[in-house]
């Protein structure tokens, strides 16, 4: 029973690990986790490349909770950079 509870808790928190470990401290973001770094290959706005989205050059909004593009006209609901999802 205890093992089942531990597994359930882990499964609940693993998808949110980046939100927990990538907190903003004193206005500066911590280094990104490997999970976040892995998103580069999917064209998500990434702070590792100077705050730019991969391919289209849109700027990251560091205040945004999910690191979405700050160009709100082009930012999708899923925080993909516009026009790059299938590049």
UniProtKB/Swiss-Prot annotation:
Its tissue distribution reads:
Expressed by the venom duct.
Q: Where does it live in the cell? A: Secreted
Asked whether the keyword Secreted is assigned, the reply is yes
Keywords, sorted A to Z? Disulfide bond, Neurotoxin, Secreted, Signal, Toxin
Q: How is it modified after translation?
A: Contains 4 disulfide bonds.
Leader sequence segment = 1-19
Positions annotated as propeptide: 20-42
Task: List, alphabetically, the Pfam families matched.
Answer: Conotoxin
Q: GO MF annotations for this entry?
A: ion channel inhibitor activity; toxin activity
What is any one of the record's Gene Ontology cellular component terms? extracellular region
Q: Which InterPro entries match?
A: Conotoxin (IPR004214)
The record's similarity note reads: Belongs to the conotoxin O1 superfamily.
Q: Anything noted about its domains?
A: The cysteine framework is XII (C-C-C-C-CC-C-C).
What name does this protein carry? Answer: Conotoxin Cl12.3
> What is the native source organism of this protein?
Californiconus californicus
